[in-house]
Curated annotation (Swiss-Prot):
InterPro entries: Ribosomal_bS16, Ribosomal_bS16_CS, Ribosomal_bS16_dom_sf. The keyword DNA-binding does not apply. This is Small ribosomal subunit protein bS16. GO terms for biological process: translation. Belongs to the bacterial ribosomal protein bS16 family. The keyword Protease does not apply. Pfam families: Ribosomal_S16 (PF00886). It comes from Rickettsia prowazekii (strain Madrid E). The lineage of its organism: Bacteria, Pseudomonadati, Pseudomonadota, Alphaproteobacteria, Rickettsiales. The gene is rpsP. Keywords: Ribonucleoprotein, Ribosomal protein.
Length: 111
């Protein structure tokens, strides 16, 4: 069973709130999950300490068992001071290189 560390959306319309969960990779985004390991509230100021709350010990455990974080969650994990496995870091770098950057509307009008 492939396991992911990802965000599950909650909250009301136009007021998002996310749980950082450990879930089966094939499960729906907001569906069943194995464990809740944190929260993310994008409505709070970026310097607020409660914007991202993570259980570091449980995340380290799941990373050790082979769970793969999504790109956004991997950024949260790195900011929290948890080291990601080399394999996960390498995959993130490859994805970043392959990502196509579209020019903004201003850049396309100027050309």
């Amino acid at each position: 069973m492939a396991v992911k560390i990802r965000l599950a959306r909650g909250g009301a319309k136009k007021r998002p709130f996310y749980r950082v969960v450990i879930a089966n990779a094939t499960a729906p985004r907001d569906g069943d999950f194995l464990e809740k390991v944190g929260t993310y509230n994008p409505m709070l100021a970026s310097d607020n300490s409660e914007r991202v709350i993570l259980k570091k010990d449980r995340i380290e455990y799941w990373l050790g068992t082979g769970a793969k974080p999504t790109e956004r969650v991997a950024k949260f994990i790195e900011k929290a001071g948890v080291t990601l496995p080399k394999k996960v870091k390498k995959e993130m770098e490859v994805k970043a290189k392959n990502r196509k950057v579209r020019p903004s509307k201003k850049q396309s009008k100027e050309s």
